[in-house]
């Protein structure tokens, strides 16, 4: 029986794609200059994860093991193309901001990794839930990273939200503080590495605190047993 609570815990925290597996670092560090870009890329990746997991789970019994990886990549590429066309049609500003990193979702190790490790071995519903949780976990890291870098670098939050949500979302842009010039380090990849390292360190500290709160299991002393080899 599928343990959905464990799947959620693995995707959101214990085996988080960004903080634990360190997968998808290229778009994670390059695109997260603003919260809008981070959220847009996270949603796109999550949609591809869910779709690819479901489709691969449905065809897993019909694909020979020898060619499964090329077939998986073709399915993922088709879904990424569909998502790319949708973003191009309905969020063109975001499409231009994400640039090459949107089609590069095809090469994201998170997606092919979940296809091989989970979707190819489980039913469609469980695979969809796994894709959702892994996608949410990755999106949360993107959002935290994007929000932190935007606040430190520009002093704003959700700048350019209209590119993702439409003209009405301009009202969502929030000025945290007024800056005369942007903090360049936070907007460049070195700043992304620093913030990412701090997020990973924070997670490790929280994990350590959680382990310390867990009651220690008492170890039962082993009892030596006499072995009778001969009865006189």
Curated annotation (Swiss-Prot):
Q: Where in the cell does this protein reside? A: Cell inner membrane
Which Enzyme Commission number(s) are on file for it? 7.-.-.-
User: Which keywords does UniProt give here?
Assistant: Cell inner membrane, Cell membrane, Electron transport, Membrane, Translocase, Transmembrane, Transmembrane helix, Transport
Enzyme class comes to translocase
Presence of keyword Disulfide bond = no
Family named by the database record: Belongs to the NqrDE/RnfAE family.
Question: What functional role does this protein have?
Answer: Part of a membrane-bound complex that couples electron transfer with translocation of ions across the membrane.
Cite the record's note on assembly.
The complex is composed of six subunits: RnfA, RnfB, RnfC, RnfD, RnfE and RnfG.
Q: What is the protein name for this chain?
A: Ion-translocating oxidoreductase complex subunit E
The species this protein belongs to is Shewanella oneidensis (strain ATCC 700550 / JCM 31522 / CIP 106686 / LMG 19005 / NCIMB 14063 / MR-1)
């Amino acid at each position: 029986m599928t343990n959905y609570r464990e799947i959620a815990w693995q995707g959101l925290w214990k085996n988080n794609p960004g903080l634990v597996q360190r997968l998808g670092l290229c778009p994670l560090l390059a695109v997260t200059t603003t919260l809008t870009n981070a959220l847009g890329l996270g949603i796109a990746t999550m949609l591809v994860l869910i779709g690819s997991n479901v489709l691969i789970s449905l065809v897993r019994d019909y694909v020979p093991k020898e060619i499964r990886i090329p077939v998986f990549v073709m399915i993922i590429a088709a879904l990424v193309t569909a998502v790319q066309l949708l973003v191009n049609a309905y969020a063109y500003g975001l499409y231009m901001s994400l640039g090459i990193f949107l089609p590069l979702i095809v090469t994201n190790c998170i997606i092919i990794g979940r296809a091989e490790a989970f979707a190819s071995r489980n039913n469609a519903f469980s695979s969809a839930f796994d894709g959702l949780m892994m996608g949410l976990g990755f999106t949360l890291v993107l959002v935290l990273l994007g929000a932190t870098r935007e606040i430190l670098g520009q002093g704003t939050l959700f700048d350019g939200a209209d590119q993702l949500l439409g003209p009405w979302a301009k009202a969502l842009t929030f000025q945290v503080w007024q800056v005369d010039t942007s903090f360049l380090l936070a907007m460049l990849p070195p700043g992304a590495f620093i913030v990412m390292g701090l997020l990973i360190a924070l997670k490790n500290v929280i994990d350590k605190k959680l382990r310390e709160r867990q009651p220690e299991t008492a170890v039962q002393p082993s009892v030596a047993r006499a072995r009778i080899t001969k009865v006189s």
